[in-house]
């Protein structure tokens, strides 16, 4: 499995100009996730970095996720998997037929995009994971949007 650097140094934290409203003495800051160097940056890269650490220490050979194929989450997960030399499989609701830049990018990265009715998402995910296991593969599933423990941990570090 290839090593990749999703981000290597702390990001700047920028103060926000005073907001309108009564916030007392509170001050607001923004962590500049847009400056992350991997896959055009953003908060989803921060989440992907936590999943990367888990995948790197597992026997996974297929990365699976759920989401709109045009989402930043799917783009970043497909990019991460390709950068690691792993296959990627995206389960996407068929109600999402719009082809945007991210959709083309996900496909160019070699990810398989499988559509299903939104009512069949859980069943489709379980069936696909089982099919990969029957093939002798080891799928690693990332919840849509990168939600879950690793994604949450990325914000408390």
Residue ranges, per PLM feature:
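PLP-dependent amino-acid enzyme catalytic core
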Residues: 1-157
């Amino acid at each position: 499995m290839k090593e990749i650097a999703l981000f290597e140094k702390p990001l700047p934290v920028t103060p926000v100009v005073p907001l309108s409203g009564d916030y007392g003495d509170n001050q607001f800051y923004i962590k500049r996730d847009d400056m992350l160097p991997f896959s055009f940056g953003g908060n989803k890269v921060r989440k992907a970095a936590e999943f990367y650490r888990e995948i790197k220490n597992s026997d996974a050979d297929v990365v699976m996720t759920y989401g709109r194929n045009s989402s930043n989450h799917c783009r970043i997960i497909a990019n991460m998997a390709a950068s690691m030399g792993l296959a990627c499989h995206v389960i996407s609701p068929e109600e999402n037929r719009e082809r945007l830049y991210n959709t083309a990018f996900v496909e160019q990265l070699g990810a398989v995009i499988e559509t299903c009715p939104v009512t069949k998402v859980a069943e489709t995910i379980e069936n696909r994971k089982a099919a990969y296991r029957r093939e002798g593969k080891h799928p690693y599933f990332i919840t849509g949007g990168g939600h879950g423990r690793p994604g949450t941990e990325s914000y408390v570090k």
